[in-house]
From Swiss-Prot:
Involved in the gluconeogenesis. Catalyzes the conversion of oxaloacetate (OAA) to phosphoenolpyruvate (PEP) through direct phosphoryl transfer between the nucleoside triphosphate and OAA. Keywords: ATP-binding, Cytoplasm, Decarboxylase, Gluconeogenesis, Lyase, Manganese, Metal-binding, Nucleotide-binding. GO terms for molecular function: ATP binding; metal ion binding; phosphoenolpyruvate carboxykinase (ATP) activity. CDD domains: PEPCK_ATP. The gene is pckA. Substrate binds at residues 60, 195, 201, 324. Pathway: Carbohydrate biosynthesis; gluconeogenesis. Its main location: cytoplasm. The keyword Plastid does not apply. This is Phosphoenolpyruvate carboxykinase (ATP). Belongs to the phosphoenolpyruvate carboxykinase (ATP) family. PANTHER family: PHOSPHOENOLPYRUVATE CARBOXYKINASE (ATP), PHOSPHOENOLPYRUVATE CARBOXYKINASE ATP.
Length: 530
């Protein structure tokens, strides 16, 4: 179909969808704005961003995600708490009810691509009942040109119906909400949730299955940027570790902020947009992202808005702390328009260690890099409402466990091979606490973290001297421009050295306990890192 075509009930027969009312084919942003306002789905805020509410779900419904247990993918999926099996017959029955639900409804289609690389991009189609979800898909995925739309044949389709609910007793779901991926039918169905992030992350899960399994392309939950000389850096990290902040640097161009592939040519963005957390966002700390909240085309999820003045309050968490902005990457200055870069020179693994015992930066051997990649460690501090003040260790393998469909060892082996082949420098960066655990020490200054990352990327650290950390076996630099020397070794800034030793030992034990699950699939050298 052409850009902004409208048909009455025709064009979706291949998906089993007949008798829909108006079908809007890849409508542009301005048309979607008109539809969103007309249908009461959102408000246009001061300076043009669109404010919407997601209702009951203000984040991913992790317990409602399934993968259909069918012969083509059954033996490759890493089944467990994350990848739950779903009965094929139940899927077919649920899907038939969904298609019946769409009778007489207006639908919004976005035909686009997942992946910036022409070699590996996946043609996709997003069919949505909400106009703002169609705008979200338009923002987040790679847009097709007018010529490409003429012959667009989706290889995966997302059908997103927030107002359609499952019946758990009949459908075999856990609740009325569901996100189900069917690799045999190349289909994702979503119902019972208006949280748009489910669209993005379901396609990420699809790519995390297809690319490593079929094309030996490393799929990564990471940000990436490139320097003036073309040197690429990849930043792995869980939420809250500084992935977006540290990859946004004035002297480097952004390739992408969240999802990437690494093939024989280099790194490429999976997306055409960004989905940034914006709670307490300020113009001073994050000027580029702040400006996107004032731009036409940006979607502001669950952000407080004055309905009279239409001004937004980014500090208001009345609806959720997980307020988000979805915007095309072109809203950000200093980007790589192609979404592609060369092979990484540096890989940085970010952690926010609330125990305060990991160094602010350390050089990793290839074996240590594998260990920390498989561990995916960070630490969180629970909210005061729960009465918990002690840090809690979190391990999310490959820095993105909820989205990894294959066994973690598949991704680890791909990363190991690429690090070796391209002689990549690997670093562990702790953006968490220093001088003591949470409640005693203080958060690492962002200025120090930026200086350390810059020194790693420009070669300053590699050219200097290192000392061996006695607890974690890490190489710690002896000096870094712009960072006090005593900060570099975490033990030095703890007033109570015995407390440091005990806390560090406890964290080592947490690492070891978590890593037991991987020992059978790694070399002895990796298994014995800690």
């Amino acid at each position: 179909m052409k850009l902004n075509d409208v048909t009455r009930g025709t064009g979706l027969e291949e998906h089993g969808i007949i008798n829909a009312n108006l079908i809007y084919w890849t409508p542009p942003t301005a048309v979607l704005y008109e539809q969103i306002v007309e249908r009461g789905e959102g408000l246009v805020s001061h300076l043009g961003a669109l404010a919407v509410k997601t209702g009951h779900y203000t984040g991913r419904a992790a317990n409602e995600k399934f993968i259909v247990d069918e012969p083509t993918s059954r033996d490759h999926i890493n089944w467990g708490k994350v990848n739950r099996p779903f009965d094929p017959e139940k899927f077919d029955s649920l899907y038939k009810r969904m298609t019946a639900y769409m009778h007489g409804k207006d639908l919004f289609i976005q035909d686009c691509f997942a992946g910036a690389s022409p070699k590996h991009r996946l043609p996709i189609r997003v069919i949505a009942e909400k106009a703002w979800h169609s705008l979200f898909a338009r923002n987040m995925f790679v847009k097709a040109t007018a010529a490409e739309l003429e012959n667009h044949k989706p290889r995966f389709t997302v059908i997103d119906m927030p107002n359609f609910h499952a019946v758990p007793q009949i459908d075999g779901t856990n609740s009325e909400t569901f996100i189900i991926i069917n690799f045999a039918k190349r289909l994702v169905i979503i119902g019972g949730t208006s949280y748009a992030g489910e669209i993005k992350k379901s396609i990420f899960t699809v790519l995390n299955y297809l690319l490593p399994h079929h094309s030996k392309v490393m799929s990564m939950h990471c940000s990436a940027n490139t320097g003036e000389k073309g040197d690429v850096a990849v930043f792995f990290g869980l939420s809250g570790t500084g992935k977006t902040t540290l990859s946004a640097a004035p002297n480097r161009s952004l390739i992408g902020d969240d999802e990437h592939g690494w093939d024989d040519d280099g790194v490429f963005n999976f997306e055409g947009g960004c989905y940034a957390k914006i709670i307490n966002l300020s113009k001073e700390s994050e000027p580029e992202i702040y400006e996107t909240t004032r731009k036409f085309g940006t979607i502001l999820e669950n952000v407080a808005i004055d309905t009279i003045s239409r001004r937004i309050d980014l500090n208001d968490d009345s609806f959720t702390e997980n307020t988000r902005a979805s915007y095309p990457i072109t809203h950000i200055p200093n980007i790589v328009p192609s979404g592609m870069g060369g092979h990484p020179t540096n890989v940085i693994m970010l952690t926010c260690d609330a125990f305060g015992v990991l160094p602010p930066i350390a050089r990793l051997t290839p074996e240590q890099a594998m260990y920390h990649f498989l561990s995916g460690y960070t630490a969180k501090v629970a909210g005061t409402e729960a009465g918990i003040t002690e840090p809690q260790a979190t391990f999310s393998t490959c820095f993105g466990a909820p989205f990894m469909a294959l066994h973690p060892s598949v991704y680890a082996e791909l990363l190991k091979a690429k690090i070796a082949r391209h002689k990549v420098n690997c670093w562990l960066v702790n953006t968490g606490w220093s001088g003591g655990a949470y409640g005693v020490g203080s958060r690492m200054k962002i200025g120090y973290s930026r200086a350390l990352v810059n020194a790693a990327l420009d070669g300053t650290l590699a050219a200097g001297q290192f000392e061996k950390d006695s607890v974690f076996g890490l190489d710690i630099p002896r000096a870094c421009p712009g960072v006090p020397g005593e900060v570099l070794n975490p033990r030095n800034v703890w007033a109570d050295k015995a407390a440091y030793d005990a806390t560090a030992k406890d964290l080592v034990e947490m690492f070891r306990k978590n890593f037991e699950q991987f020992k059978a699939n790694v070399s002895q050298e990796v298994a014995c890192v800690l």
